[in-house]
A protein has these predicted regions:
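N-terminal small/polar loop signature for handling phosphorylated ligands or for N-terminal nucleophile
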Residues: 1-35, 39-43
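Flexible glycine/proline-rich
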Residues: 42-202
């Protein structure tokens, strides 16, 4: 946990910069106290992308910064050892996820989980999608691709998906009722009953 101050964020990011991968949640939007990107730049961060054309989850960042130390094992457990001298060429990769829980979960499934699988040496690293028929019509018209909490159910005649009623990216109760996210592409005005759509599993 970090307070929304530059000093506290600096300390936490300094600690995280000794790991191979650092995850941050919150502070990556455009508000007065969203300081994560600014502080990361002070560490020499290189950003691969800042923001994604999805909803929820638009304010997400991914990049890397010079690794500032390492972890070693001793008799009393694991401890950190800051690097002295010039940078040794190693990187700490980072994700800055949105603070809202549904947004963070969508971004984790889309971006973070594949990165973790890659670091673990897995051959299949991509997000997992399945196809299902819409059990009810869904209104479209969004300018970004939407990932809406949804419930998959199946039988002998195939798999259906139904959007879970929710009140936004902070609605953890509604999100918990689903088992995936139905993918609604940008620019489509209407998604009729029976349409085959993709569903992101979580």
């Amino acid at each position: 946990m970090a307070r929304d101050t530059r000093a506290d964020l600096f300390e936490r990011i300094a600690q995280g910069s000794m790991w191979d991968l650092m995850l941050l949640s919150g502070g990556v939007s455009m508000g007065k106290y969203d300081l994560v990107e600014e502080v990361l730049r002070e560490f020499g961060a290189e950003f691969f992308f800042t923001g994604a054309l999805i909803q929820p989850g638009k304010p997400v960042v991914f990049g890397r910064l010079p690794k500032r130390g390492s972890f070693q094992h001793g008799e009393d457990g694991e401890y950190s050892v800051p690097h002295d001298g010039p940078w040794n060429g190693e990187w700490t990769y980072f994700f800055g996820l949105p603070g809202n829980p549904v947004s963070a979960q969508v971004c984790f499934a889309l971006f973070v989980a594949p990165m973790l699988r890659a670091l673990a040496g897995r051959s299949e690293i991509a997000p997992v999608f399945v196809e299902a028929r819409l059990a009810e019509e869904v209104k479209g018209g969004a300018r970004v691709t939407r990932f809406l909490p949804a419930e998959l159910s199946g039988g002998w005649d195939g798999v259906e998906v139904r959007v879970v009623g929710w009140q936004g990216s902070g609605d953890v109760v509604a999100n918990a009722r689903g088992n995936g996210y139905v993918v609604l592409p940008a620019g489509v005005e209407h998604f009729p009953i029976g349409l085959t759509v993709r569903v992101l599993l979580r």
